[in-house]
Every structure is written in structure tokens, then in C-alpha cells.
Amino acid sequence: MTEDNIAPITSVKVVTDKCTYKDNELLTKYSYENAVVTKTASGRFDVTPTVQDYVFKLDLKKPEKLGIMLIGLGGNNGSTLVASVLANKHNVEFQTKEGVKQPNYFGSMTQCSTLKLGIDAEGNDVYAPFNSLLPMVSPNDFVVSGWDINNADLYEAMQRSQVLEYDLQQRLKAKMSLVKPLPSIYYPDFIAANQDERANNCINLDEKGNVTTRGKWTHLQRIRRDIQNFKEENALDKVIVLWTANTERYVEVSPGVNDTMENLLQSIKNDHEEIAPSTIFAAASILEGVPYINGSPQNTFVPGLVQLAEHEGTFIAGDDLKSGQTKLKSVLAQFLVDAGIKPVSIASYNHLGNNDGYNLSAPKQFRSKEISKSSVIDDIIASNDILYNDKLGKKVDHCIVIKYMKPVGDSKVAMDEYYSELMLGGHNRISIHNVCEDSLLATPLIIDLLVMTEFCTRVSYKKVDPVKEDAGKFENFYPVLTFLSYWLKAPLTRPGFHPVNGLNKQRTALENFLRLLIGLPSQNELRFEERLL
């Protein structure tokens, strides 16, 4: 930090000449080091280190309030999110069988985790809260609205979800009753038929009150107006839209339908049968310049929609929240492979009794979830051609089962077995039984996705020209926000790039991203203070 500039009041101050604070902006010089690798015919790796200098710019002025619009506002996740914000904002304590509880955001990485800053004078690690390094919006400042195909207010939705303690529900009743979802879009072919009984709050009704899939462009325009009205009525500068509604079936990606931006928009106008409700919401958000996050496993981001985001410069992220079984899998599978142990089969079984499980009991919707859950180990397998190759086999037998069991409600039961090959024909079996309250794991992830998406909207960068230091203009990130992969089962990537699923790699990327912005080097564990004389 230069002496003639004063840093904003934060918990962390870095003494460095890499950072300059000016007019509510933080400018940081950063040298990105990597290595380009080629493999010769003889099997030798030729490695060439590379360096590219950048200047990053962060707008230090976070919004006083952030608009959040959820598709599926009246579902388990939506009602739990609103309840958590209200409970924390108003400090609503409540009784449980274990005594009085204070509200918190446990399970949220941005609110309740720490990261290593460095060491103290004795060589001990020093940690700071994740959200203390740079200004981040607080979930207490969320202004939440959204859409749902069911018209229940959020107190009714909270009761129906059976997620929160009874006393907390009663203490939040007055405030939750005031929140009512906007009418949503319901195309019956895309979700399970058993959801039809809930669909009493839809914009796509004909003159006789029957659901119609005609007029999809009109539906898109309606969603755009909803976003505009929400911003205006609440005096919001920023809004983020997130899908936490039912899992849809996969859509067919077809030339002339959804393969390009132009074809996609025309297909919406033509009421094409492969235009799903999530496509309408995503396109409307992108056209409004509002970031859109897909929290479910369906393939909303067809090529035409990604092109639209590129054209409009609007952030998108997906797919599917990574909360329990899959998050553990992304850690355990990486551990086994990095240890030189070869997983040969992974069997994953779930049963749950909430509406998510009810919808997933239909084969087409289950297939969407199966695809997102199974892809989590792909890059981990590809990272080790000693264990996985043409001779030994390149695949892991990976089975996923999800069953609906109404009595267990939101307490999802997950059972996994990892069967691995050891040296000299030996085998290892790891069996895991995990019971988690699904929505209380998923809701903090939604909070993190929203906080970090807003943060990324305030970051820009430019490459440093070695000849003309002031050349170039600041650019935003590429529209697909892969920095958010930590919270997503099947991370959407830039076309031509492969997703990173390993949880530790994803967390490291986030930590180093924050560190570079405040002028700290990337994290390492060399610990020379101890290991060298």
C-alpha cells in the first residue's frame, strides 16, 4: 500500500507496494505464474515457465442492499433462506429441546470460515475471517423476492417444508407471512407430473385458466418486467437471480434450436417445445444484465444461452448445489487418487422425503441429477494416468441411486461405498453413512454464491503491456464464473475448458484470488521457517 493512500477500514491491512487505494478503488499489481507443458514422443515432459503481469481493480463500495430473486421462492431452500436472513438480521433467538439458540450462518464459507494470512513472530499460523479481507455484502442486507408455481406465502411454505424449529417458525410468522411469491412459469413436460397439484400460481394460463406453453416470448418479457419492478420498488442497484426450483428434465441440444444465441431467441418466439422455464428465466436475466445462477442439475446453459451471456456481458454460473454427498466425494476421491490408491467402484445411494425427492422420483428428472452427481470425479481420474490408462482401464464404476421416502422429510440419508485397489492385489473398502438436513446445508451455499457473485461484479482487470504500461482497458471476467465452482456439483466452464471438481483445488483458487487482490502471494505450505537451517 502506498503511503499517500489510505486503505478503507477493514480487518486486514497489508503493507505492500503492490496495492494502491484511490477513490473507493483498490488497484493491485499481480504476476500470474504458470507453466506450459509438452510431452515428447519419448515420454519426456518439457516444461516452460510463463509469467503474465496484470493490474486488478476492485470497487470497494459494496451495495447497502442486494436484491435477490429466487425461482422456487416457496420451496424448502427459498423459505429457509428468507427465514435465515430475517432471523439473523433481527437477531431472533429461539427455543429448541437443547435450549436457547442464537441465529447464525453456520455452513456458509463466506460468513463462518477463515483463511490463513501468514505467520506470527513465533512461526504460528494466523487466520482471519474469509469476509474480512475485502468488503463483501452481508446476507443481512439481502432483499429477497422471487417466483413460485405455488401461491403459499412464506410462512405457509416454511411450515410445509418442516425444516426449521417450531419456535423459530412462530417467531418469524409475522414477517414471513408478508412475503408472497410472484407467479411463475409452469411447463408440465419439464418437471414430474406429481408437481401439478402445486401449480396454482402460474403466468402461463389461457383465457379458460388452463396451463399453456404458448406465448413463451411473452413469458420472457413478463419476467423481465418483474425484475425491473423489483429493482425500482426497492431502489436496488444490483439484483441476482438464482434457480432453486424443481429439477427439470434435460433439454435436447439441437442445431437451429438452441445452438446459437440467434436460434435460441427465435425458438423462444416460436414456442419451441425444448424451451424450458429455466431457459426463459435465464434469458430474461441475461437480457436485463442480471447475473443468473442455476442451482439445479438440468442443462439450462445450452450453447445459445452461453453465447447470449457472452454477447450481453452478463455473469452466469451453474450447475447444481454441492452440499453433502457430492461435496464429500470431491474430497475423498481426490484424497484416494492423490495417495496413489485406485478407486475402482463408487456406489452412492440416497433417500429423502422433501419435495425435491418427490420430483426426482420421476425418471427424466432423476436423470438430470444422476448426470450432475456422476461427473464430479471425472477430472480426478484424468489427473492420474498411472492408475487410469488404456491397459488398466480409464473408468470407475460409478452408480447413483435416489429414492423418495416421505417420512424422512428434509433429512436426506446418503450411503456410499468406495472400493479401491491396493498394491499386489489388495483391496480397500470405505463405507460411509451420512444423514443431513438437506436445506440447512444447501441454504448457506446459496448465500455464498450470492455474496461471491456480487463481489465478482466489482472486480476488473487488464493485462500489463511491457512496452506501454498504461495501455489497455479494464475488462470484466469472462461471463461464466468458474470461481464459484466450490459450491456447484457440475461446474459450468468456458467452452473448450474442462471443469475442476476437486474441492481443495476450488477452495485454493478462491483463497488465492482474495490474496492477490490485497497484495499477498499465493498460498503455499513450504514452511521454510521450520525446515531450513
Curated annotation (Swiss-Prot):
Disulfide-bonded cysteines: none
Localization per record: Cytoplasm
Sites bearing Phosphoserine, chain numbering: 177, 184, 296, 368, 374
Recorded metabolic or biological pathway in which this protein acts: Polyol metabolism; myo-inositol biosynthesis; myo-inositol from D-glucose 6-phosphate: step 1/2
pH dependence: Optimum pH is 7.2-7.7.
Disruption of the gene: reported phenotype: Inositol auxotrophy.
Cellular compartments per GO CC: cytoplasm
Principal subcellular localisation of the protein: cytoplasm
Quaternary data: Homotetramer.
Physiological role: Key enzyme in myo-inositol biosynthesis pathway that catalyzes the conversion of glucose 6-phosphate to 1-myo-inositol 1-phosphate in a NAD-dependent manner. Rate-limiting enzyme in the synthesis of all inositol-containing compounds.
Family per similarity comment: Belongs to the myo-inositol 1-phosphate synthase family.
Protein name: Inositol-3-phosphate synthase
Organism, as annotated: Saccharomyces cerevisiae (strain ATCC 204508 / S288c) (Baker's yeast)
Gene behind this protein: INO1
